[in-house]
């Protein structure tokens, strides 16, 4: 955080960096009485004192100072004051989908910077998808040689080497961001199956969907497929220090499993009810493998739509499909005492534009006011159930959302979501919040972020989301 302070705060002022044992103009003090990730900034006539209980708190103090000095290039005067600030939730996350569309490393860093600036502490990196496998796995080179280039779109070829990923992890660590990798299983596996068809139920070549997903998922009946996935997780765990590994689990159609002799045999051998129970069994095998490595497994809420084979106690559920299933996954997860991350697609999926575009019909649009006033995830957190860890928001790259389109989908709506993740007190009325957003717009644009329309009525007929 001191490097961040020098780069983002002192560089805008005439202050010179010099460590002193006493009489410093800016003092950094560890104060264990402050909440985790909380901080206090006290401004005296001759001195600024910054206190925090941990690295996260100091990092967020720097991010606050960064906004205070925004636009300044010379001397700055602060009024004497005291500010104490701390987060509402322990899980504040941004998801970036690099599976469907590959982004340059500079782009990944840009959105890690953004997450830290908005006082988030997790970056959920969606690295595997039907349209692309983006993480180098040394034991299985064809995952990236073949699976990294199956897409035909503008930005659908490419992958990240393990060395590049290590650099990104360190870049995030310096900004108090933990990167949570997602290796999606058993569904959204077409890119992997294009490289290794034997991992599917019938061992046949697979077609790569231009969007959505197909019946081609990892076979849960083959021991070889389970060994493959565990070997992949070995390399993922060696690479990522995160205590959490996301294993996907969403949108896994069971048509092939229902016809597959290996899957039918597995259901009989394990005493399972059906293919839905088989997915629970499969998920439990993967979660238990992560447990043996001291990690927790996150699954999308689809895995708890049906009761059945129990998941282990290192399981976390991410509730997402509010549009299709309302709060079913949230309720079932809480019933089984699984911790929950709230990311209801209404209104945290920021690939949903403000107005219709391509496959996003009017029913899949929302604006800043919708987010601020009607977010089901915000309302769930307000219930203060200790099982609810916090909130995540997402930028999926369905329908060809390329790098140049990302900012205008995120901003300004992500500012409402970051406010809900962090702020515990009474919310401002929307009009006042919107005025604050407009006041801060120039600074975010100076920091390199492009704003899109905030409200539906702001969107002109000729506005181009792409």
Label the model's feature ranges.
Residues 34-246, 260, 285, 289, ...:
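Feature activates predominantly on carbohydrate-active enzymes
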Residues 4, 110, 160-167, 224-231, ...:
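Generic recognition of stable, solvent-exposed alpha-helical segments in well-folded globular domains
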Residues 15, 120, 177, 295, ...:
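Short glycine/serine/threonine/alanine-rich loop segments
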Residues 297-302, 309-466:
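Flexible, acidic glycine-rich loops studded with aromatic residues
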Residues 1-89, 405, 421-455, 463:
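Contiguous, structured surface segment used for ligand recognition
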Residues 192-198, 206-316, 320-337:
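Active-site neighborhood of glycoside hydrolase catalytic domains
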Residues 129-130, 185-187, 304, 347, ...:
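Conserved beta-strand edge residues that scaffold enzyme active sites
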Residues 17-19, 181, 299, 342:
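A structural preference for short, hydrophobic beta-strand core positions in alpha/beta folds
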């Amino acid at each position: 955080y001191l490097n961040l302070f020098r780069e983002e705060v002192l560089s805008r002022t005439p202050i010179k960096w010099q460590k002193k044992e006493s009489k410093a103009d800016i003092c950094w003090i560890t104060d264990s009485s402050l909440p985790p990730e909380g901080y206090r900034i006290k401004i005296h006539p001759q001195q600024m004192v910054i206190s925090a209980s941990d690295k996260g708190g100091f990092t967020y103090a720097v991010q606050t100072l960064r906004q205070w000095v925004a636009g300044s290039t010379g001397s700055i005067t602060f009024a004497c004051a005291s500010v104490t600030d701390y987060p509402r939730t322990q899980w504040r996350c941004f998801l970036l989908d690099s599976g469907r569309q590959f982004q340059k490393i500079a782009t990944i860093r840009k959105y890690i910077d953004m997450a830290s600036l908005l006082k988030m502490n997790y970056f959920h990196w969606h690295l595997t998808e039907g349209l692309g496998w983006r993480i180098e796995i040394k034991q299985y080179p064809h995952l990236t040689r073949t699976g990294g280039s199956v897409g035909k779109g503008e930005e659908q070829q490419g992958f990240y080497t393990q060395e590049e990923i290590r650099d990104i992890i360190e870049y995030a660590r310096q900004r108090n961001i933990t990167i949570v990798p997602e290796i999606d299983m058993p569904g959204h596996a077409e890119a992997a199956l294009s490289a290794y068809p034997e991992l599917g139920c019938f061992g046949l070549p697979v077609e790569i969907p231009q969007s959505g997903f197909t019946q081609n998922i990892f076979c849960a009946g083959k021991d070889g497929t389970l060994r493959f996935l565990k070997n992949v997780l070995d390399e993922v765990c060696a690479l990522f220090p995160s205590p959490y590994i996301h294993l996907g689990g969403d949108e896994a159609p069971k048509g092939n499993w229902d016809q597959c002799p290996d899957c039918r045999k597995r259901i009989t051998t394990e005493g399972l009810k059906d293919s839905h129970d088989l997915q629970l069994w499969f998920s439990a095998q993967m979660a238990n493998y992560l447990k043996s490595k001291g990690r927790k497994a996150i699954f999308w809420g689809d895995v708890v739509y049906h009761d059945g084979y129990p998941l282990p106690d290192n399981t976390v559920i991410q509730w997402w499909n509010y549009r299709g299933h309302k709060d079913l996954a949230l309720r079932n997860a809480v019933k089984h005492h699984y911790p929950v991350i709230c990311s209801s697609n209404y209104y945290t999926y920021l690939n949903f534009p403000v107005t219709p575009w391509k496959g996003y019909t009017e029913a899949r649009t929302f604006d800043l006011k919708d987010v601020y006033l009607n977010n089901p995830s915000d309302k769930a957190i307000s219930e203060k159930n200790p099982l609810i860890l916090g909130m995540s928001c997402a930028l999926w790259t369905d329908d060809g959302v390329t790098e140049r389109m990302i900012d205008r989908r995120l901003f300004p709506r992500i500012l409402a979501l970051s406010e809900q993740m962090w702020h515990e007190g009474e919310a401002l009325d929307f009009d006042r919040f919107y005025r604050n957003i407009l006041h801060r717009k120039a600074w975010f644009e100076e920091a390199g972020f492009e704003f899109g329309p905030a409200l539906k009525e702001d969107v002109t007929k000729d506005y181009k989301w792409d």
